Amino acid sequence: MKLSKTCLSLFAALAGSLSGAQALAHDMVPGKAAEGPLLLTGLTIHTVTDGVKTDSDILIVDGKIAAVGQNLSAPQDATVLALDGKHLYPGLIALANQLGLIEIEAVRSTDDSREVTQTNPDIKAKVGYNADSEVIPTIRSNGFAYSMIYPDGSMLMGQSSLMQLDAWNYQDAVVTDGTGLHVRWPNASTLGSRWNPKPADEVRKANAEQLAKLQQYFQAAKAYYDAEQAGLNRGIDSRWHEMLAVFKGERPLFVHADDERQIRQAMLLAKEYNLKLTIVGGRDSWRLADELAAAKVAVIYTAP
């Protein structure tokens, strides 16, 4: 049987695509859930708030810690594992990152981290999460069990999600669907970039326009919230509807900002709408540490 050059090309392309897909996937199989209670004995347990407990046991029921102590009694149907001398640490949570959303930064087809417009408060990071990312095993080997991922972009970027890192797909991985709304705060510096140098007046004007636009978005979202509370909304606007939980105080507002002026502007907006504010980045947060503490504003420090 003879194969045409076209067929051979198609086979080669298919083989290449399959090998490429395999190269972007890890071979770790998610652990099987324990059948019934699980008792681990003889451990050195490093707790979050109660120091280190030696020669201790831990009882896990329905995937959650039910008891910690010495000489715990095993339920009748429990599996008992003697782990004498082993150390047990709580899993770490990686905050405000894009694990599973970006595989190779230089390859656009592996980047599912952002949308193209400025108003995406209804975008959820979980949908773009790749549970088969090659990066995940490395992160897990360093003690991380969870990751709070967020969609990138400008202004209203979208909703972050808390994911557990031992999963087949994003549906299995989701722990908390919406952990908060992420906003990239407009530039406050009057210096142009070296790639796009502009006079200070032009930069200042552009900054003011972007800040005014962001304030308009929040005004529209607050108007939608007020109408919702009064039962006057006649339809659903998915953008502002997803922000209802932020105005209700059920979810925090994560503002990505480094400059002191940006942080102050974000604090004013949070105070105006009575929002739970968390600063992400926070390079200059040390300059107003007392004010942040007084306003109960949390900081996820990621700035170099």
What are these regions (language model features)?
Residues 30-32, 45, 49-89:
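Histidine-rich, glycine-flanked metal-binding segment
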Residues 142-277:
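Polyanionic/metal-chelating signatures
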Residues 270-276, 293-300:
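Glycine-enriched alpha-helix->loop->beta-strand junction motifs that scaffold or abut catalytic
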Residues 23-44:
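Short N-terminal segments immediately surrounding and downstream of signal-peptide cleavage
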Residues 16-20:
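N-terminal signal peptide c-region/cleavage motif recognized by signal peptidases
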Residues 86-142, 147-150:
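Metal-associated gating/positioning segment near the N- to mid-region
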Residues 1-10:
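Bacterial N-terminal signal peptides that target proteins for export
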Residues 282-284, 302-304:
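Short, acidic/turn-prone active-site loops that include or flank metal/cofactor-
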